[in-house]
Structures are given as structure tokens and as C-alpha cells.
A protein has these predicted regions:
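Hydrophobic transmembrane alpha-helices that form the core helical bundles
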Residues: 37-40, 60-138, 142-146, 290-310, ...
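Helix-loop junctions at the membrane interface of multi-pass solute transporters
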Residues: 36-38, 68, 80, 84-86, ...
Length: 473
């Protein structure tokens, strides 16, 4: 491996590759787990479907904002670049540090363990074996991306096609039950239940969680061919396709299981497959979820590593992350660092020693009980989600700052219905920040502890180089 370049390679990602990354990251495991939680908190099936459609519309609202930013500033790192330009070097540093220490690495760890958990549905696995499988997933995906951008994108394309076809098969199973198997069709619900606004608000949280991750595609904007054209197209086409898949999947769940049956189901996709074909739905859906989780891990590993590479190019503390492999056109050191932190997190919440260490640290901060019985990796998601939404909101605010403060930059794509569109995007992020922080309660401190080290690192080491000339991609 030769690390002779501090800049990303020439563009090697086409429009289809960019769409594949978006679909691959967003369509993870939530569409198989969230629907019962959504429909249990609404007053009618129509309301539930409306929330899924509204979630897609809100995601598209955000995508319109990112489309303008990505087309105007098609640089490596995405949000890192936007926030640095809008708020200064410290803001960019904090975004990169947050993603390395909390956001992307925790998401990779969580998805890797989901893969291991569902592998345990196919083959009996001890907790130690699941831990090994999760670590293996991170190392496997990292190894594939270390082979180069082409290898990483090819793996992403295969996994995205596989998970999309699998989800289409689940959708087909639901409609088959409704139209071709009337004897298996669920009986209509006798009455509707009432749901208060807070319940609908909670349902919306689950919906928006299922749409999360699409913004990661902006991290690789500098490697996309004709980014001024293809980044807006990829964002809008990718999220439109995801919205259609999600609405159809939920309609299929309702068609095959009924509203009451869906609310009561722990595994709606598995039940649909079993009713429609008689095959073991548990096996089929476990394989599908594993493919979905693997695709999400690969997409996050591919895109996230570009953020740390950009961090290394501009901040001497992380300069070692900023070098690119000239031969394979990939930020190898960033990929390795990302894998190391993700594996550390798997060990931290997946072992008794790690959980005891977390208990001790949060105990010092006044949180006396971490609900490990809910699942260690669910705790990880709850602890880090507020950090994600905070930085997402900052990008929304950066949109306004850059639109008004950098009017000289050409904008090949302009967000429609300005300023309503970015205001709605910021409002959505603010609502999710509040909701996720309320849901996490004291657990949010787990995510804030590593984040709090960021300003200290910056002021002790990096602020003296503010006037230096730094590399930009």
C-alpha cells in the first residue's frame, strides 16, 4: 500500500453507484422492525400509511437542501465541508470527530451486531460467538474497501440489488395473500383505536429513523462523476425509490396481516412469507435482514471513511488519516481507524467487562442504571441518536449561512420553495433531536462523553495551526 496522496482519486462513482449507496445505507433493518411500532401508535391504517408517506416527503425535503449543497460544494466529507465553511474550522473538526468517535462507528457496530443476531436465528450461536461474527463483519467489509473504491462500490451494488429484490419479494407475498389467497386474508378490524398526538409523534420518530442515513452519500461527492448533476439526481431518485418501497411494504403488511395482526407481530415480513408460500419465513427473512445489515455496514464504511480523511487533511492531530492509497484510490488509514473504533464499541457493549466499564463511567456522571436488558446495541443507538440529529440540524442551519454568505458560488441546483424547504428540514431535525434526547434521557451522556473531548483536543493541539495553509479536496 502506498499512501502518497492527500487527495481523493478522480471520480469513479456513477449515478447508479450513488443511488446504490443511498438505498444500501437507508434500507437497513428498520423496515422489518418499525412497522408494528408505527401502526400501534395511530388511530387507523390510513393514518399509518400517511405517516410513512410523510416520512418520505420530509426526507425528500432534506434531500433538496443537500442537493443544493452537494452540487455547489462537491468536495469530500459532505457535511464536514458545509459546516466548516459556514461556522469555521472548529465546527468542521467537531463534525469529523463526532463521526469518528460516536456517530458512524456506533452505527457500524450496531448493524454488525444485527447481522450476528439474525445469524443466530439460523444457526445457534452463543453470545461470544455473536460477538465474533459482529467483529468479523466489520473486518470483512473493511477488507473489501481496502481493496479499493471499485471493490467497495461493487460490493455495495450487489448487496443493494439483493436487498431490494428481497424486499420486493416480501411485498409480492403480501399482495399475493390479498388478491390470490382470500382464504388466508385477515379479517377486517371491527373498530378503530384512538391515538393521541404524542402517540402519533412517537410513530413519526420510528418512521424518520427508518429513513435515516441518506445524507452520507454527500461524503463521497468528490468521487461522483459530474457531481453538479448527479448528486441532486442521486439524492432525489434514491429517496423517491425508498419511499415507494417503504409505502408498498407497509401496504403489503396490512394486506397480508391486517392492521391488528401487524400491530401484534414481532416479525411481519416472516409471517407474510410463511402465509404466502408455506416456506420458513423465519429463515428467508433472517437472510434478508442479514443482507440488508451488511449493505448498510458497507455503505457507512465506504462513505464515513471520507469524513476522517478530510479531517486528516485539515487538522494536524489527525494528519495520519488524511493520506490516500494511490494505487487503490481509497483512504486506507481512515478505513482501518474506523474499523478499530467500531470493533472497540462492539467489545464495549457486547461484553461483560465493557458494560461494567460503561456502568462505572456513567455512574460518575449521575446515571445509576443502564438498561442493558433492552439490548446493548439498542442502548448504543439511543445514546448516540441525539448527537446525530444535532449535527444534522447544524447542516440545515449552515444551508442558510452559505446561501446568504456565499452567494458568489455557482449553484447548479437550487432548493425549491426557499426558504420554506430548509425551514421545514430544520424543524424536522429539531423535533428529532428533542425526541431522541427525551427518549435517551441519561443515556445521552454516553454519546456526549467522547464528544466532549473534541474541543479540548482542538484547543490544545490544533488551534495553533488555524493560520496554516491546509489541503482541501
Amino acid at each position: 500500500m502506498r499512501d502518497g496522496s492527500a487527495r481523493p482519486a478522480s471520480p469513479r462513482l456513477g449515478l447508479a453507484d450513488a443511488v446504490s449507496i443511498i438505498v444500501g445505507i437507508v434500507v437497513g433493518t428498520a423496515i422489518f422492525k418499525a412497522p408494528p411500532l408505527v401502526f400501534a401508535n395511530v388511530s387507523s391504517p390510513v393514518t399509518g400509511l400517511g405517516l410513512w408517506l410523510a416520512g418520505g416527503v420530509l426526507a425528500l425535503v432534506g434531500a433538496c437542501c443537500y442537493a443544493e449543497l452537494a452540487a455547489a460544494y462537491p468536495h469530500s466529507g459532505g457535511d464536514y465541508d458545509y459546516q466548516r465553511r459556514a461556522f469555521g474550522r472548529l465546527a468542521g473538526f467537531m463534525f469529523g470527530w463526532a463521526h469518528l468517535s460516536v456517530i458512524i462507528t456506533a452505527s457500524i457496530a450496531q448493524m454488525a451486531y444485527v447481522f450476528a443476531d439474525y445469524a443466530g436465528e439460523l444457526v445457534p450461536l452463543s453470545e461470544r460467538a455473536k460477538l465474533g461474527v459482529a467483529l468479523g463483519v466489520v473486518l470483512l467489509v473493511t477488507g473489501a474497501n481496502l481493496r479499493g473504491l471499485v471493490a467497495g462500490k461493487n460490493l455495495q451494488n450487489v448487496l443493494t440489488v439483493a436487498k431490494t429484490l428481497g424486499l420486493v419479494a416480501v411485498i409480492a407475498a403480501g399482495f399475493t395473500i390479498y388478491f390470490a389467497m382470500p382464504e388466508a386474508r385477515p379479517a377486517a378490524a371491527a373498530a378503530e383505536r384512538s391515538a393521541s398526538s404524542p402517540a402519533i409523534g412517537l410513530a413519526m420518530v420510528f418512521v424518520l429513523y427508518a429513513f435515516g442515513g441518506w445524507n452520507d452519500s454527500a461524503f463521497v461527492a468528490s468521487e461522483v462523476e459530474s457531481p453538479h448533476r448527479n448528486m441532486p439526481l442521486a439524492l432525489l431518485a434514491g429517496l423517491s425509490a425508498i419511499t415507494a418501497l417503504y409505502v408498498l411494504a407497509n401496504l403489503a403488511y396490512l394486506s397480508g396481516l391486517g392492521w391488528i395482526g401487524l400491530c401484534a407481530s414481532d416479525a411481519p415480513a416472516a409471517e407474510l412469507v410463511e402465509r404466502a408460500s408455506g416456506a420458513s419465513g423465519k429463515v428467508v427473512v433472517s437472510l434478508l435482514v442479514m443482507v440488508s445489515a451488511l449493505g448498510a455496514v458497507n455503505g457507512m464504511a465506504l462513505t464515513g471513511s471520507r469524513v476522517y480523511a478530510r479531517l486528516g487533511q485539515e487538522h494536524r492531530l489527525f494528519r495520519w488519516l488524511g493520506m490516500w492509497d494511490e494505487v487503490r484510490h481509497t483512504p486506507a488509514r481512515s478505513l482501518i481507524a474506523q474499523a478499530a473504533v467500531s470493533c472497540f464499541m462492539i467489545g464495549l457493549v457486547g461484553t461483560d467487562v465493557g458494560r461494567a466499564s460503561v456502568d462505572q463511567v456513567v455512574g460518575w456522571l449521575g446515571v445509576h442504571s443502564v438498561p442493558w436488558s433492552d439490548g446493548g446495541f439498542d442502548v448504543l443507538v439511543r445514546a448516540t441518536a441525539p448527537v446525530f440529529w444535532f449535527f444534522f440540524l447544524l447542516t440545515g442551519i449552515a444551508f442558510f449561512v452559505l446561501r446568504h454568505g456565499d452567494g458568489a458560488t455557482r449553484r447548479p441546483f437550487r432548493t425549491p420553495l426557499y426558504p420554506l424547504t430548509p425551514i421545514l428540514f430544520c424543524a424536522t431535525c429539531g423535533y428529532m433531536l428533542y425526541s431522541s434526547a427525551t427518549y435517551a434521557q441519561g443515556l445521552v451522556l454516553i454519546g456526549l462523553v467522547p464528544l466532549a473531548a473534541g474541543p479540548l483536543l482542538y484547543w490544545l493541539v490544533d488551534r495553533r495551526s488555524d493560520s496554516d495553509q491546509h489541503l482541501t479536496s
